[in-house]
């Protein structure tokens, strides 16, 4: 990703010539939107959208990048793209990806829906290893075993280089109150303790 490359170069080689990469960035095609308002998977008019396809990789701009932050149109387009591909619910890794994107988009309903599917199906083994499918009918897949913490972190604390937001995408059920300790943010700060209680209307950090 060009944005990530330039950001890294600014940190590790601030005096380096970036003209080549900036020129390449200007050659990248703009985002395109389909007739539902969703972000298109391919930045070309040569292909129709295939919303039966299992991946949401074109929402890279939402997660792990942060291009949707402060961009209402792109945020709405990504939310619509998630909605259009709701049929992909049989793979645990797809639900993990959907959850991470929903949390970044602060879409509590979509996040809750994905988490309910993850938690209420037979994905986990007694060993706490997880399966590729949600009926344990396939092979081992570590995405959920590793990714669940990332989902919770994204839902409870958003951070970037100069910003921290608490409870940006709290799921609609199961998270009415809780405590989180020792979370490292992207700007090198540490949330030593986050405690919330929705019934009491309190958040402390």
For every predicted segment, state its role:
Residues 1, 5, 17-20, 74, ...:
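Stable alpha-helical elements in mature extracytoplasmic
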Residues 1-14, 60-71, 97-106, 151-160:
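Well-ordered alpha-helical scaffold segments within catalytic/enzyme domains
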Residues 3-7, 22, 26, 83, ...:
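A broad, structural surface signal
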Residues 13-92, 113-129:
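Extended glycan-interaction surfaces of carbohydrate-active proteins
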Residues 14-18, 108, 142:
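Generic detection of long, well-ordered alpha-helical segments
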Residues 52, 84-89, 102, 135-143:
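Short, contiguous acidic/charged loop-to-helix segments that flank catalytic cores in large enzymes
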Residues 55-60, 89-96, 106, 140-147:
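Aromatic- and histidine-enriched alpha-helix N-cap/loop-to-helix transition segments
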Residues 109-205:
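Non-catalytic C-terminal accessory modules of carbohydrate-active enzymes
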């Amino acid at each position: 990703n060009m944005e990530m490359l330039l950001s890294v170069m600014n940190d590790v080689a601030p005096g380096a010539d970036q003209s080549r990469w900036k020129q390449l960035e200007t050659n990248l095609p703009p985002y395109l939107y389909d007739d539902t308002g969703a972000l298109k998977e391919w930045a070309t008019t040569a292909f129709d959208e295939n919303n039966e396809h299992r991946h949401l990789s074109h929402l890279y701009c939402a997660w792990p990048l942060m291009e949707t932050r402060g961009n209402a149109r792109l945020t709405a387009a990504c939310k619509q793209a998630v909605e259009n591909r709701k049929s992909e619910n049989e793979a645990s890794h797809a639900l993990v990806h959907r959850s991470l994107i929903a949390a970044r988009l602060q879409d509590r309903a979509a996040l809750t829906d994905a988490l309910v599917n993850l938690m209420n199906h037979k994905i986990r083994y007694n060993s706490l290893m997880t399966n590729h499918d949600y009926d344990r009918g396939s092979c081992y897949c570590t995405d959920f075993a590793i990714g669940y913490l990332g989902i919770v972190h994204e839902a409870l604390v958003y951070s970037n280089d100069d910003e921290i937001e608490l409870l940006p995408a709290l799921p609609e059920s199961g998270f009415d109150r809780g405590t989180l300790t020792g979370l490292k943010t992207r700007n090198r700060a540490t949330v030593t303790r986050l405690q919330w209680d929705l019934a009491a209307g309190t958040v402390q950090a």
